[in-house]
Amino acid sequence: MNLHSIQNISICWLSFLGISLSACQSEEVQILRPSPLPQDQQIQVYTNHEPASSYTEPYRQITRDGDNLEQAIIDAISSARSTVDMAVQEFRLPGIAQAMAERQKAGVRIRLILENTYSRPLSSFTAEELNRMEKRDRDRAEETRRIIDQNGDGQLSLDEINNRDALIVLDRANVPRIDDTADGSSGSNLMHHKFVVVDGQTMIVTSANFTTSDVHGDFKSPNSRGNANNLLKIQSPALATLFTEEFNLMWGDGPGGKPPSSLFGLKKPFRPVRQVMVGNTKVKVQFSPTSRSVSWQQSSNGLIGQTLSSASKSVSMALFVFSDQQLVDLLEPTHQRQVEIKALIDPGFAYRSYSEALDMMGITLAEDCKYEASNHPWKPAIATVGVPRMPPGDLLHHKFGIVDQQTVIAGSHNWTNAANNGNDETVLIIHNPVVAAHYQREFERLYTNAIVGIPPAIKKKVEAQAKECPVTTAIAPRPLPQKTVSAVTPQRVKPAQPLSSLTGKPQSTQKTQQTSVTSKQANRRINLNSASQAELETLPGIGPGLAKRIIVARQQKQFASLADVDRVSGVGPKLLEKLKDRIVW
């Protein structure tokens, strides 16, 4: 153990052996930190809660534990001499934007791809537009406004906007950028990548969006330390070539290309897993999505499953969400071979009816006395599945697995059907014990104080359902329409309830492909489980925001009754009355 961060603290002795003291005694306390782990020469790992490191945040000026992920990205960009290609779902950090603008002015070719939901500068929204937003979106906008409002006076000056609104910084520097509408559509399922390629040889691959919430912490929550995320810095021209190929497919001819040549989502050609050597390390990479016409075994989730199945000693998983039934079914024989399996899942998803955490714990949860037909509770179950204790408002946003403390599964790809079959994603498989040790330390940090096993509230819910649902029916699994698969947008799903309220159902927000509809379709019945966003918006009382929430809800659980619809945020008795004769499932 190394000694770090000597801090002065005041200890007030109010009484000792019956003697009252009126003053405080100042005492120096030495804080022990674990020693930094060795890094591989070509593959470095960073986590924003790393206990061996500390840094002072650039925006809130809080000194805290963790690796500064933003600085790692800035350093990589600042080293560029010829090119920087970046694909990231959401980009709000001005430090990264300023580094890109500086390199652009120095003659480096910069290209940026965003998810279209986040491609508009936050400072450009009017007060009226902000007031019309859902509360979650307003909170997100307020977070970004506080980054921009450098002097904290509640007003955004032109100077603050020009220097602190990340997308304005890039636009003023003439950095070319596109989003997933560049293919001529209204947007793909979700452009969920989070990678940077510098000079065709250095890569940043991370689970974090470039936001304060994912990297540092929220302004509104002083105790927030950012959603738990990891970042890989990799030096490999061979691997960079594969990432550049993925980038170029999406970029096409860039801004204003006619006809549109960009390819997103399932428009991209299928490419199987590729393998390269990074020094002495075997690295596999696969880019999502994979069409359902291709076998699951050849998909990104299939690659994850193959890697998990190779375990002989242990599997540790830290996941934002885990809802692919085939993956958990592949894990069960591994468990039966006496392989130790541990899993941590974000509290907002761990105990939902579709969560594979329930299967591993040997239980099922019904919705209206209906169970998913494919559920398969483990026998014997395991008690090493649970949720981490995070600072209020922070999420477990990792998407990693560790096999035998030798192999790491990482990237942007959530372990869901939505990520597998609809989104632009990255999965990396890295066979390197030095790299794995960093992920193992992060897992153990999260697991040390985690709530594992079946919580009492969930146990009571299972017991109550056993009494209320003596005869249960199964919900047959339905294939997701290709144009409506989506994945979770992290900043929109932060559970407001404490861990003691684990039976709640926090709402998540996702996005779907919009397609045009004609006015002649306005009066026909709409299938809520397959309609596009544009079709949903033809229904009375449903605007863009509610249409997106309906799509979010059906990706997690298909609608089977009006009661299911009633659970969607923004739907009430009056709207149900308007909809009941207009919708089917």
Predicted regions and their residues:
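Primarily N-terminal secretory
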Residues: K483-R524, S530
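Bacterial signal peptide processing site
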Residues: Q25-E27
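Alpha-helical interaction/regulatory segments in DNA maintenance proteins
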Residues: T515-S519, V552, Q556, D566-W585
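Small-residue hinge/turn detector
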Residues: G543-P544, G572
